[in-house]
Amino acid sequence: MSYPGGKGGAGVFQTIINQQPPHAVYIEPFLGGGSILLAKRPASTNVGIDADRSVTDKWSGARGVDVIWGNGISYLQKQRDRLGPDALVYCDPPYVLSTRDRDRRLYNCEMSDAQHARLLAVLQELRCMVQVSGYYSAMYAKALSKWRLIRYMAMTRGGLREECLWMNYPQPELLHDYRYLGDDYRERERIRRKALRWVARIASLPELERRAILSAVAV
């Protein structure tokens, strides 16, 4: 689904997914085109919320996803005590207007600075894992100053631009989805081909030998 500000660009969704630890519950309170939700390995429970009815209508019938038409900030506030360490919230809200080229409005449901401030306050109350995407802004930098931050380049309609990804957890030692491991396309391809070679090599072994190796690796 094409969507302004979507995260489907080369190197963008991979960067975000490579920062996601294992989780049982996955929530996108600003669903939009859902590029990350569609690209990542599903969690046991997947929830997408959007205030724009035209967006949620396009998601009607999506399998394995609870799609909700509503206010994502209010949803998180209501679910605050139910979201534990096994949940991951990925927030990709409409970016702060002052950070955009010519302050262009792109969405049917934009957010004021006051709404961004409310979102930041709610996110800091959550006990679960949280990721937040956005252009750099003083508001986000101040509110999330104690969170981990990585920066990456994304292609926009106006050309390449640096984006930020804030997280309230340390660099993950384990990932929810390993398919995009690697810092760039070349490294991802190297790892993918290496994995295929190892799979083929192990698959060619006699049954008992193969099981012995897999058992040793699983320890």
PLM feature segments, named:
Residues 1-219:
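Class I S-adenosyl-L-methionine-dependent methyltransferase catalytic core
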